[in-house]
Amino acid sequence: MSKPLVSHIDKEAQKDEFRNILKPIYSNLKGCDRYIRLAILTGVSRFSRLSIFSDLNNLDDISMDSEFAAICGINEEEMLRDCRPGIQRLADYNEFSYDEAVARLKNNYDGYHFARHCPDIYNPFSLLSALRKREIGDYWFATGTPTFLLKSILHKGVNLEHYLNSRKANITSLSSIESYSSNIVPMMFQTGYLTIKGFDRENGYFKLGIPNREVERGLFRGLMPLLADISGDDAGDFIIDSARMLREGNADGFLTGLQTLLAGVSYELTGTKSEIFFENNLYVIFTMLGFDVQTEYHTSDGRIDVLIRTPKYVYIIELKRDSSPEAALAQINSKHYESPFRADSRAIVKIGVNFSTATRNLTAWLIES
């Protein structure tokens, strides 16, 4: 079902047209006060400057009120109390323990917070779908993802990992959408891509992040076709092949595949910030693989561009733009980027990569084990 305002938030003329249609619908409610004892109006967003509710000015907005923070969704106490038979069926069907089933449900569907004081909230649609089908799957994103929002994220030209996991916002900015083009964080919060992860009492702002693995996978699955010329079965094959090669220590094979993937990317997406674009590609791909990946990982003597940890290998990747892989590898060694991982039982693989702004692709790399 199309959402008249949210679906057209990037189209000012249509947004105003729909606003004018919706306004009298809500205005009629105020004239029905004597017939209505209690009414709850729900939706994704409040458009404060659109004046849809200007005539209906006696509403009490409880969107971020801690007293009502758990009014929607299912908290963990409720799930463990009321869904135990379904959780056990899920565990039995997939041949893992009850506790592991709970952990997987939590990892995939928990993590929403809608106010400063709020218990962990599970996505009810996804949780109940998983219990009914006895399968940990991605159910919420089957309902669709707004492409304009994904494109807006990419065109910010920012490091995706930090943008999606280290956002800060005050309650005023999160409460309503003024213009998606100037700040898309409120839209991402209100549509469920970001949620409250903490509160800075001294400075009065919320810390935001991705709620859970289902949202993360769905978001990145939507971003991947925009980052590279790949989708559908080809994307699945690439992810499977990449996972296998990195688990086996075949960094050269992975980088060759990535080079082929990036060859089809248009200049419109990469623009002038090619290095950030490449880092974002790696971050999205490795997150979809399920690996522990961090970009701009800080050490005592510098910053690792990309750090990937698989069960058997720790990959340290340094990116250079219009330089050489030798220079990139020399930086890894001179700054001793491997030092924090020397006690790790996994093999350390250092990779120096050169990225060309002319071709918008990686041109050469050196690997040192």
Question: Which positions does each model-derived feature cover?
Answer:
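Acidic-basic catalytic patches of nuclease active cores, encompassing PD-(D/E)XK
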Residues: T260-Q294
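Mg2+/Mn2+-dependent nuclease catalytic core
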Residues: K15-N20, R321-E338
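Phosphate-binding site recognition
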Residues: M1-S274
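Metal-dependent nuclease catalytic cores in nucleic-acid-processing enzymes
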Residues: I25-C32, P186-L194, Y283-T287, F291, ...
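Domain-level recognition of nuclease-like catalytic cores that cleave nucleotide substrates
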Residues: P340, D344-S369
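Active-site metal-binding core of divalent-cation-utilizing nuclease and nuclease-like domains
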Residues: I285-P311
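Conserved catalytic cores of phosphodiester-cleaving nucleases, focusing on short active-site segments
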Residues: L282, I304-R321, K335
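Switch/connector loops and helix/strand junctions flanking conserved nucleotide-binding motifs
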Residues: P4-V6, S48-S54, P325-A328, A358-A364
